[in-house]
């Protein structure tokens, strides 16, 4: 009944209502593959320390490792997780809370960093969703089409991580420079399409 408050508000409503042991997210323009949940739940059974499992949106992104651990130190430089690919233990919501409803862009990066600061996060080397009804990623449509605002959101996430003592000042500076370079690269790619 709440007026459209954006993706974080919608996700938080779902998180607040969730009762199960695991929580999975699904964006409106994505579709889970039929074996997504089964594949990801089996990962939790392999290692009780795992609290968060992501998957791939594209078979072309597959790598040699079946499972790749993604520590916070990696997540600072690249968001490996697309929201519709993730599943995590319910306990995470109790411990870290909800998505930041004041952040409209790159809000999942903030949430995933907060998770990775406390939990073991892994990436399953398997496509688990049909992403965005075929859209081509950043700069194409939806919120991610606004590259400038997405970059501001990413820089906000890095500032948050530094202020929370998740990362050192050195890591913060390197991550900001790297993020800005990625931003200019994205602009170039979009202009050349």
Give the label of every model feature segment.
Residues 131, 142-168:
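Catalytic core of nucleotide-sugar-dependent glycosyltransferases
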Residues 26-28, 54:
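Active-site acidic Asp-centered loop
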Residues 11, 32-37, 49, 115:
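Acidic donor-diphosphate engagement hotspot in glycosyltransferases and nucleotidyltransferases
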Residues 1-19, 31:
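Conserved donor nucleotide-binding strand/loop of the catalytic core
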Residues 23:
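Short aromatic/hydrophobic "clamp" motif used to bind/position activated sugar donors
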Residues 5, 30-31, 57, 103:
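Acidic metal-phosphate-binding loop of nucleotide-sugar-dependent transferases
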Residues 35-65:
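Conserved donor NDP-sugar-binding/catalytic core segment of glycosyltransferases
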Residues 16, 55, 69-149:
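Conserved nucleotide-sugar donor-binding catalytic segment
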